[in-house]
């Protein structure tokens, strides 16, 4: 009977253990005016270890990803997660205004989720519900206004 109870006690541990080891992280890139996803955007992620920690040998600490049709890029953290994580997306600066880089503590990302810097926008054009779930980084880009597009060639240098 005791052996049966031991095995029965191990079942929840085996069931809950694997999701804790390889935590999935999703990076979403959206249009701040309407909430639509930005597709085919380059996303770069750096895993930053503290105090001499190193990523596993079979895991690259510098990832290069691309958003899919839903505006998402996904990856899994290694079994020994980094203390911090840096993520940035490269958008066309002639069309988009974006604070598209974040440096976050991995613990905060897994527990709460992170919303990147939101570019300033006119209140009537902003997309209100900007929230990130646990394990999610949300980066918001805003299309340039007509005036910003007209002035862009003069200020880009």
Feature locations, PLM:
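Short, ordered, surface-exposed loop/turn motifs in non-cytosolic proteins
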Residues: 33-51
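Short Pro-Gly-centered beta-turn/loop motif in secreted/extracellular proteins
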Residues: 74-86
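Feature of secretome-associated and extracellular-like proteins
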Residues: 86-157
